[in-house]
Amino acid sequence: AERVAKLFLTKSAWAMILALLVALLGLRYPFLPRHITLAGSLSIGIPGFFLALMPNPRLYRPGFVERTLRFAVPAGAIIAFTVLGTNLAAERIGIPTAHAQTLSTLVLTLAGLGVITILEWPLSGWRTAVVSAMAAGLVLALVIPFVREFFALVVPTPAEAAAALGIAALATAAIAAMTARVR
């Protein structure tokens, strides 16, 4: 239950921090609502459902709220700043809006899958299957034309896809490093 709580609170943290940053800085929000639906489904909702049903051999330890917040708030901040930075950089170098939004959606979803990987480490069995299926779902959303159109995505260029993977990997590494310090 603690890992699933961390997952859902991380989403709440990045959503709140990103909304505050966009409002305070007077920036355009980096997503359409459809993008949030896709990212949230693949990196929080669907995996959260399956992960909550899996057996958890860990015993209860006092300090649930503190541990959960000490993970979720910094992880959410890292994701929010990463997504905002990605979007600002894309705009700065002249990437069209649809591509910038797709890039931000990819970074958000992949960083969310990184959070699941961190929380469920070491991955094995069903946990690996869940993360792999969600990553495959993201790829399918990009390559199936009617799904891509429904979610208002564009096929990223190879450079954009590589950038999204690299940026999400850096965000995941930052979250993993932060996690190692707060345990």
Q: Can you describe what each PLM-predicted range is?
A:
Residues 1-123, 142-143:
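Membrane-embedded transport module
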